[in-house]
Amino acid sequence: MDVQYRPDQIEAQAQQYWDDNQSFKVTEDASKEKFYCLSMFPYPSGRLHMGHVRNYSIGDVVSRYQRMLGKNVLQPMGWDAFGLPAENAAIKNKVAPAKWTFENIDYMRGQLQRLGFGYDWGRELATCTPEYYRWEQWFFTKLYEKGLVYRKMSTVNWDPVDQTVLANEQVIDGRGWRSGALVEQKEIPQWFIKITDYADELLNDLDQLDGWPEQVKTMQRNWIGRSEGVELDFPIEGEESLRVYTTRPDTLMGVSYVAVAAGHPLAQKAAAANHEVADFIKECQNTKTAEADMATMEKKGIYTGLTATHPISGEAVPVWIANFVLMGYGTGAVMAVPAHDQRDFEFAQKYGLPINQVIEPANGEPIDLALEAFTGKGTLIHSGEFDGLSSAEAFNAIANWLSERSLGEKKVNYRLRDWGVSRQRYWGTPIPMVETEDGTLHPTPEDQLPVALPTDVEMDGVTSPIKADPEWAKTTFNGQPALRETDTFDTFMESSWYYARYCSPQSDTAMLDPAATNYWLPVDQYIGGIEHAILHLLYSRFFHKLLRDTGLVNCDEPFKQLLCQGMVLKDGAKMSKSKGNTVDPQQMIEEYGADTVRLFMMFAAPPEQSLEWNDAGVEGAFRFIKRLWRLVAEHVEAGNTGTLDVNALDDAGKALRRKTHETIQKVSDDYGRRNTFNTAIAAVMELINEVSKFDAATDNALAVKQEALEAAVLLLAPIIPHAGHSLWQALGHDEAVIDASWPSVDESALVKDSIELVVQVNGKVRAKLNVPANADKASVESLAMDEPNVKKFTEGKTVRKVIVVPGKLVNIVAN
């Protein structure tokens, strides 16, 4: 065995062995317990970054550990390959998005292989291939047939430079997040999937997800936003009644105005007759629309000239247009109670509208409505027949009053909106719908799928090539001329079901092969960043339930356990090209080897926490592997070891063996239960320290050292698999470490012959005492009293009491 650690050679040999033996190729095996470990697949941007390396290192460690436990482990990899960056790169580099994407995939695949990740590459998929997206198109047509898909006109944030629709969160200070252009509001027909039909199930099933971080579940609960309230009508003379939704019907008697969104039909009608209203609406359309911004932005409004009638009191209530009311939430109209809602309060103060208190604190505490709204619950006042009721009692009483008169009804509302899946981009999955000349919409027939995206295109940066080419859209439906939909799917569609396709990626007769899918699913461990807590993880859960209800999967949830790894930081900030603080994984691998990079990634922080990149830490990881290598080389050089005779061990041998099995016990818990790989590595480092100090002068001592080194190699094999491969062979094993079992704890090795006790006199430590582990209290007491330092501090005193706490301490009370 070469005494020098040469990572480039060692890693090439291990990877060659895995390739030759197809070590990570798996098939269904009913006789074995399965474990499906999945890390979120990357966008093929061109190069891996350290965030990828961390994510995939964690997944690989979990996968290799579970394999050593004897499980049938699936760990696949693929590419989330559609999306805007490919279009931008195509324009910049004058190359078709498909060519750019596949070149990036080839390069990044090589990087992943160089890191030694144990993927079943036979299952590799790229979402931009027709073999993949044809099934997404097929599934969409099935959802359409089931009534879960519809098209409607929808107001969108339109980026005039990028020529695309932006999500609310992509509008920053009224400008497109990427182009910086002023965003416009535009109405276009868009396709939606009815995620709201599943809102209750998506909410309730979060309670089943015991293996998910509480933070992620809370974020999803808030996003779904279930609320119970009342929907009621404010009549308007000569107009349709204005319908509003409120979660606080107890405050209804305090309404002093109603407010509608700029896009509300009443607002549009008012704008047609009043240019000031029209100008205000235009201004609203160019301000921030992300919900989070609503709380902090300046409240602005304009009076429409219309007056509504309060449904209970009959009083006149002015109708305003307000920039804080969103058309996308509720009915696009709100009843405003300035005394009991801070946003309504700020608006009322600005425009001199009445602030009518109708709730007082139940404890009678005074409130100052000149300063702020009182938003708590309490007892009703100034509310006619409802005076004296608590807020909870008034909720039902007012709801019933309205219901009896057909003026309102109780209603459950959701913050969640149906999923708009249309994108006006080229590089995405074509939406498989056609429109015949009579305006009827039809799903593309199955025998015409996939609707393939042309890949040999030139990008002009303005119009999608499939929109620019009128010939592409021309097709027939039942022999009649028809036009294809030229929008493409939101790329969250592809990532919402890829985990299921990995179970049978080669299937060309079905979206999912039932036997394979129901063997592997659900995913046992999913790993990815918390930035995906809402959209990707919610859409995947939704898609899974759609797959279940179409008979394609038989479980309710896609991911049993979720681990959200922390970011990789440098100089205290997230690595980014703009900050100039990135570290190229490729450079690190070439300098130190993949195992060192993996070891550093797993040692520097627990997986859920942010990791601070530290060159000295990488150097330290490299030194540790070299040290382990040298220890094994020296041990092998010392000659063959015989069989370990545990009964013939001296105290030093027993101590090393105890340390070995304590380490196995701790590391097994760190890997299996806690996911704290950093403390697992620290424990193995401690064991290696003990091994290096151990004097193996006899055959039996060499044998106990062999056991310790074997344990260290096995415990680190999931983290440094290449070095583990060579070291395991060097230690005399014919089987590869990839096929070795996880070491088991010998409980008898943990039993101590003697234990150390602290001896206190009057509560102060005066001695430490080694006693036989099985010594009785009387013996311990006698040994403690014989300690010279104890004698010194009890001399001339009367010993009143001796307290023996077994296995811990002796406390002598003397005065």
UniProtKB/Swiss-Prot annotation:
It catalyses: tRNA(Leu) + L-leucine + ATP = L-leucyl-tRNA(Leu) + AMP + diphosphate. A motif ('KMSKS' region) lies at residues 574-578. One of its GO terms (cellular component) is cytosol. ATP binds at K577. GO terms for biological process: leucyl-tRNA aminoacylation. Coiled coil: none annotated. Its EC number is 6.1.1.4. HAMAP family: Leu_tRNA_synth_B. It is found in: Cytoplasm. Signal peptide: none annotated. A motif ('HIGH' region) lies at residues 42-52. GO terms for molecular function: aminoacyl-tRNA deacylase activity; ATP binding; leucine-tRNA ligase activity. It is an enzyme of class 6 (ligase). Pfam families: Anticodon_1, tRNA-synt_1, tRNA-synt_1_2, tRNA-synt_1g. The lineage of its organism: Bacteria, Pseudomonadati, Pseudomonadota, Gammaproteobacteria, Oceanospirillales. PROSITE patterns: AA_TRNA_LIGASE_I (PS00178). Belongs to the class-I aminoacyl-tRNA synthetase family. This is Leucine--tRNA ligase. Keywords: Aminoacyl-tRNA synthetase, ATP-binding, Cytoplasm, Ligase, Nucleotide-binding, Protein biosynthesis.
